[in-house]
């Protein structure tokens, strides 16, 4: 702490926005793997990987698609997705174009619709399959419940066969339409400053109706930077991020901090830590991907403590991090 305090914050942290983070990471790490998606929890299964350069291209394309749909810096983009690569396009492309609003799919339609209406969500990015939580049918119902919505973007499942996508009615597009937009710059020409609002995150709703908390770009950038400094995160690190991305733990320390530092971040199936097979195979996944740190909430750590190593080599792990409300 004393070492960090010897430099003014503006000098130590010149980055203004989450968008700047991804521009810098793509320049620094290029073809290095940024995100690894595991279609199943089987350690032998072939993963899907995106490099830092590919991730920035996708962020540009997504932001430009949203801009084309009328999203501006004051407009909210709601997100209803499981664990998937495209969640990162929705998050960071949404923040580059407007204000992202990640949503917990386990909340009732009424609670989600109320939050979207409060945020005046203009676009909803939703998973185009039922999955285990009825994503697509919920998205269709929300479309009728939220008066401010002008468009719904469908995210196809990773294993959807060519030509199997359903016909979409007016006002609905496949997120793959992003490929029709430039991937090397923001068409809007937006210059994001630290005080701009980046996201609306909702509280858990355990003490009544969920409430919206505003995140500025500067606050998210500082949180990511602080995590990197405190934990000594470095480009050779590899971590499994099994948190849901409607939760700040999954988005800020679990994703933004790692992706600002050149880390390979693993997305363990669409079910994340809710997938029992991910927990059962966790130590074998650590061995397969040579993970260097373990990150989970206490309930997940308790579950992992009951999973035998089964001969898995986990010697690459350097530390464990956790956190919880008390």
Protein language model features and the residues they cover:
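Conserved pre-ATP/AMP-binding loop-to-beta segment of ANL
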Residues: 13-15, 30-33, 154, 159, ...
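Conserved AMP-binding/adenylate-forming core of the ANL superfamily
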Residues: 14, 31-84, 88-91, 108-113, ...
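Conserved structural elements of the adenylate-forming
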Residues: 56-62, 180-185, 194, 198, ...
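A short helix-loop-beta submotif of the ANL/AMP-binding
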Residues: 63, 82-101, 105-109, 117-123, ...
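Conserved AMP-binding/adenylation subdomain of ANL enzymes
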Residues: 95, 221-238, 246-292, 301, ...
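Conserved ATP-dependent adenylate/AMP-binding module captured primarily in the ANL superfamily
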Residues: 107-142, 223-240, 275-291
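Adenylate-forming
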Residues: 126-138, 270-272, 289-326
């Amino acid at each position: 702490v004393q070492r960090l305090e010897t430099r003014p914050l503006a000098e130590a942290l010149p980055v203004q926005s989450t968008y700047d983070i991804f521009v810098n990471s793509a320049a620094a790490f290029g073809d290095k793997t940024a995100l690894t998606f595991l279609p199943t929890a089987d350690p032998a299964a072939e993963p899907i990987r995106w490099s830092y350069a590919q991730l920035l291209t996708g962020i540009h394309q997504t932001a430009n698609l949203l801009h084309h749909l009328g999203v501006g810096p004051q407009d909210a983009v709601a997100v209803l997705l499981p664990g998937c690569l495209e969640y990162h396009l929705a998050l960071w492309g949404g923040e580059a174009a407007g204000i992202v609003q990640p949503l917990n799919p386990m909340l009732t339609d009424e609670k989600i619709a109320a939050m979207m209406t409060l945020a005046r969500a203009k676009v909803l990015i939703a998973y185009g399959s039922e999955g285990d939580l009825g994503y697509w049918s919920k998205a269709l119902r929300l479309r009728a419940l939220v008066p401010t919505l002008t468009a719904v973007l469908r995210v196809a499942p990773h294993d959807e066969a060519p030509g199997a996508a359903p016909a979409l009615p007016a006002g609905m597009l496949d997120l793959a339409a992003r490929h029709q937009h430039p991937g090397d710059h923001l068409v809007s020409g937006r210059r994001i400053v630290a005080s701009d609002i980046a996201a609306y995150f909702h509280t858990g709703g355990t003490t009544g109706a969920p409430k919206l908390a505003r995140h500025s770009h500067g606050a998210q950038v500082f949180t990511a930077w602080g995590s990197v400094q405190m934990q000594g995160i470095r480009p050779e690190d590899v971590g499994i991020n099994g948190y849901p991305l409607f939760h700040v733990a999954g988005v800020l320390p679990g994703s933004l901090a790692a992706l600002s530092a050149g880390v390979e971040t693993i997305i363990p199936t669409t079910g994340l830590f809710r997938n029992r097979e991910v927990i059962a195979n966790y130590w074998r996944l650590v061995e397969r991907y040579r993970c260097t740190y373990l990150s989970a909430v206490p309930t997940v750590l308790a579950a992992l403590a009951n999973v035998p190593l089964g001969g898995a080599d986990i010697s690459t792990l350097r530390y464990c991090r956790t956190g919880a409300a008390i």
